[in-house]
């Protein structure tokens, strides 16, 4: 009786609760499992979905799903409770931040949405699912909140040309996890980085150092920050400003001939560049600026030119960094004076050319005279030498003739050519003979003389004899000479001999 009464007092809800309790004590049903993620990543300020889906057999039902935060070293903190009949119940600490996903909803899906995630939400979360009739299941996941960095760029001190290694700019970014900071630029320099860690984030600072030069002025220097919480890299660009002042120069006097009296529109322009932009000032070194001259920044304009505009003009360029000066000399030309100068120049040129020509002519005359004297002296030396040789030859001939006269058998064979004309006892004056012999010492001589010279020399050899003896000696000499010739058709021809040489009638010596 009591048992039946007790059974009548239990309703279906009581029986379902009892079955859930029994399932929790007996363990999970091997037929079902929970599907979730190990790590859920969300960017700061966005909504985080905490997945928890029960996958079981058909006919199984999910009674409720309980979410709790279970950080290490701390107790479980209730987050929300989803009941199949009574709906969602959120803990007061998360009121207004925990919701169910928008419909349609699956009865087996126990996922929840955590609105507007903050860094404090990072940690581990547990999903506990109670099913019928399989029992209860649980799974854990870790929520990771990314804090995107907010980079900032700070320029360094003022850059000036001529400085050493100087800080150009520094870039700082803080986030969770630590961001990456790099530089994008065409400027040559060096970088250095340092980081600082906080409880929930880390800050990174990178510095860019360079040696300032005017070529860097106006160049971009970009800080690039990379982070997982950013859809794309963040870039901050800084334009470099390097203080400098270039050398000054003045243009307008490239053709000095254009600066003549009466010219209009003449001007001088001062060229320079710098950072900050320089200012220009014109002065005249040898006095004040002439009347009518216009100063327009870097340009100095002149009225129609006169001789009063001649002078030394100075362009003074300056900025906050430095100052420069450049000066030019203006010489306004008078066309009439220029023509006179040109005539004088031509006359001087003609005189110079004439002097040079005269010098060259004198030099030529000297060379001709010297060469003539040289050749004359050379000819005299050759003539003197020839006469000496001829004298020596004649002396040898005298000795040879004397030898022939005294001992004709000791004479070698000779060859003499004579042309017989006129008196049979005389020979032609220009006839010649050649006598070749060898001295006992082995030396040889060749002689050339006329028959008249032979007769004269023969007379000189016998000065003490009478006239009869002289004629007899002459006849004897002629006879001896005729032994070497044959008469043919009124002409004397030399007999063939190994030592004889035929000489023509011109008296050449061979």
Curated annotation (Swiss-Prot):
Domain Ig-like V-type residues, every copy: 32-144
Entry-listed glycosylation sites: 281
Write down any Gene Ontology CC term: extracellular exosome
Kindly report every residue range on the membrane side named Extracellular.
Answer: 32-349
Basic and acidic residues bias spans: 399-412
Q: Which InterPro entries match?
A: CD80_C2-set (IPR013162), Ig-like_dom (IPR007110), Ig-like_dom_sf (IPR036179), Ig-like_fold (IPR013783), Ig_sub (IPR003599), Ig_sub2 (IPR003598), Ig_V-set (IPR013106), IgC1_2_Nectin-3-4-like (IPR033320)
Keyword Transmembrane part of the UniProt annotation: yes
What ranges does the record give for the region Disordered, renumbered to this chain? 399-447, 457-476
Query: What is the top-level taxon of the source organism?
Result: Eukaryota
Q: How does it sit in the membrane?
A: Single-pass type I membrane protein
Cystine pairs: 52-127, 171-223, 270-315
Q: In which tissues is it expressed?
A: Predominantly expressed in placenta. Not detected in normal breast epithelium but expressed in breast carcinoma.
One Pfam family of this chain: C2-set_2
Query: What is this protein's function per UniProt?
Result: Seems to be involved in cell adhesion through trans-homophilic and -heterophilic interactions, the latter including specifically interactions with NECTIN1. Does not act as receptor for alpha-herpesvirus entry into cells.
Q: How does it assemble?
A: Self-associates. Interacts via its Ig-like V-type domain with NECTIN1 Ig-like V-type domain. Interacts via its C-terminus with AFDN. (Microbial infection) Interacts (via N-terminus) with measles virus hemagglutinin protein.
UniProt similarity note? Belongs to the nectin family.
Q: Which disease is it linked to?
A: Ectodermal dysplasia-syndactyly syndrome 1: A form of ectodermal dysplasia, a heterogeneous group of disorders due to abnormal development of two or more ectodermal structures. EDSS1 is characterized by the association of hair and teeth abnormalities with cutaneous syndactyly of the hands and/or feet. Hair morphologic abnormalities include twists at irregular intervals (pilli torti) and swelling along the shafts, particularly associated with areas of breakage. Dental findings consist of abnormally widely spaced teeth, with peg-shaped and conical crowns. Patients have normal sweating.
Name-wise, this protein is Nectin-4
* Source taxonomy: Eukaryota, Metazoa, Chordata, Craniata, Vertebrata
Name of encoding gene = NECTIN4
